[in-house]
């Protein structure tokens, strides 16, 4: 009955590739680098994924940026920490959803913390989804892509997997 707690972790390389894709999308939205620079960064990271780790760290990005002569040498990797965090959270959520689908979980409940203020975009999602049961495939992935300036969306939205017959 509770076999979904023993699902094996997905291939770490696949998770890292998802994270690279998400980082590429978020960086394009943030406009901190040009599309050409972002493309080179993503290409380098795909070619040289981090070994023995399940996510990207600043050193990986720094090494990739060092290979691109179009990026100023004084570019600080710390300036894209938020984008890296969002990419990591989104990739982790995608892997988690894939595991949930494999074990038959089809519905989730999205809970926003009432004591926090959310950005305008997240407020719309809050009105639509807060506390409601939604199909897993229809639920948005938090943090939203547009919320790279909003810390509340990355930390204070909880997506709970629901088991039919127990939770709903």
Language model segments and positions:
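Domain-core detector
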Residues: 1-151, 159-168
């Amino acid at each position: 009955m509770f076999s979904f707690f023993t699902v094996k972790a997905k291939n770490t390389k696949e998770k890292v590739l998802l994270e690279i894709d998400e980082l590429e999308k978020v960086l394009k939205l943030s406009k901190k680098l040009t599309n050409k620079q972002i493309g080179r960064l993503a290409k380098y990271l795909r070619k040289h994924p981090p070994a023995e780790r399940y996510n990207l760290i600043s050193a990986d990005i720094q090494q990739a940026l060092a290979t691109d002569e179009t990026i100023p040498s004084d570019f600080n990797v710390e300036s894209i920490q938020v984008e890296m965090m969002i990419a990591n959270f989104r990739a982790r959520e995608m892997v988690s959803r894939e595991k949930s689908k494999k074990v038959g979980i089809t519905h989730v409940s999205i809970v926003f913390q009432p004591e926090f203020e959310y950005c305008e975009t997240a407020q719309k999602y809050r009105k639509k989804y807060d506390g409601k049961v939604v199909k897993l495939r229809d639920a948005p992935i938090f943090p939203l892509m547009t919320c790279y300036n909003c810390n509340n969306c990355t930390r204070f939205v909880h997506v709970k997997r629901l088991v039919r017959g127990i939770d709903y």
